[in-house]
Amino acid sequence: RIKENINKIENALDKIDKLDGVSYYNKLSKSNEIGLIAQDVKEVIPEVVIDGDLMGIQYGNMISLLVEGIKELNKKIEGIKELHK
């Protein structure tokens, strides 16, 4: 195995909530796109940002954050269901 110091992602929903999905015009590809702003993402989850002359986001590396966010939402939903039984 090559992974070490493995830790569960905590407070995924809080992190997701700090991000804003945007639409924008990409001057390089000359097309309208949707995504996130790398500078904003870097403040919340710097591990997924490629820092260079042009910043970029490794969107595939964000899947684990989204998975944990969904799990947190499911726990909240189950808690609400229990209250209404």
Task: Spell out what each predicted region is.
Residues 66-71, 76:
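Extended amphipathic alpha-helical segments enriched in small hydrophobics
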